Each structure stands twice: as structure tokens, then as C-alpha cells.
Amino acid sequence: MGKTTDREVLELKSINLQYANITIAGDGDIVLNKMNDVVSRQLIDARKDKAKDLEKSNEWEEIITSLHWFNGKPTDFSKKGLEKALKENAPCITAFGLKKSFGDAVVRNEIDKYKTKFDNGMNIIAKGGLIPIKFTEHFVDEKLMSPMKGKPVLVRLNRFSGWEATFTIQYTGSVYSIEQIINVINLAGFGLGIGSGRTSGYGRYHISNVEAIG
């Protein structure tokens, strides 16, 4: 006689995902400054023990490539190229940095001991991990920075006034409700901010609009 095998049927339950568009508005200026291509090449050359290039670096390449760009990195490294990019392209903040600040706010404001639950309950959906900003004015600030070794170096920082950004979040609502998520984002904007120069008060923001989309 053949053997009868009992099989356990597992029911796969779908996750009830919900979505919302969040708009954050700056409470002051934001400074955006990632490692630019000029510095990156210099570091690579130093590691390869290449002779130093005595030719003066292109300041516009430094300014332009120190930003994340939504529609790809511009190739015209000139003043006109920057002006065109600011009109036709869009500088960005990163979804990674934004979500990290949310998780940090959860811990710092003692909402939870760890940020794991929040991280697992909410995602930011962004093309290429980038969130474009809108702004009213752009400035290039020149500052002397003192590295740990060597002489002070001149750096150029992109600063934006009247900025805002809209991004889409995906959440389950099982651990953190949309109201709690909104509260966390506002706490992150007030106490942490986004971008460079946050210890100097740059990059602070608040939520200006929430739109449920599913």
C-alpha cells in the first residue's frame, strides 16, 4: 500500500502597503556638498603615487560635481553650465541620508531604544535614491577648511534658500502609523536636518504637506 503524506498548506498573507507623498520645507538654508570629482581624482592619484598635477583645477567642476543631480551629472563645467543645470536639472538630497536621520530621531527622542522597527516599517521610494529639491536662490560659499594634516584648503559649498522637497514613503502601519511617521520626520527636521553643515544649523525643515496616495 502506498504511504499517505500529510502536507501542511501555508497561507501567504500579503503585506498591506500604504503610500503617501511628503513635502518638507526648509526652515533655513540647506548646504549640499558631497566629495567632488576633482578631490576624488586627487585622492586616487595620491594612492597610486602619481606625480601631482600642477595645473589649476576647474572651480566649476568642483562646484557642479559636489552635488547629486537628478537627471545625471552635467558635463559643461562652466558658470553657464551650472546656471543651465540649475534650471533644467535638479540638485538632490539622498533618500539614504533622509531615512537615516529619521531613524536617528527615533532613538534620540527616546521613541524607541533602537531604530530597527522604524527602518523595517517605512521605506522611501526614490529614483536612483535621489530626491530633487526646489529652491528660490542658489549661492556658492567659499570657505577655508583646515584638514587634519596639511595646509588649509579653499572649498566651495552650494547653499540653497527657499528650498523644499517632495518624496514618496511606503509603510505598513502595523508598527508605526502615518501620524507617528509624520511626527518622527518633523522631529528629524527640527533636531537633525539634512545635508552638510547641520551642526551649524543648516538643513532644518518641517513637513508642509502630506498626501495619501494609496
Q: Where are the predicted features?
A:
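RNA-interacting cores
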Residues: 1-214
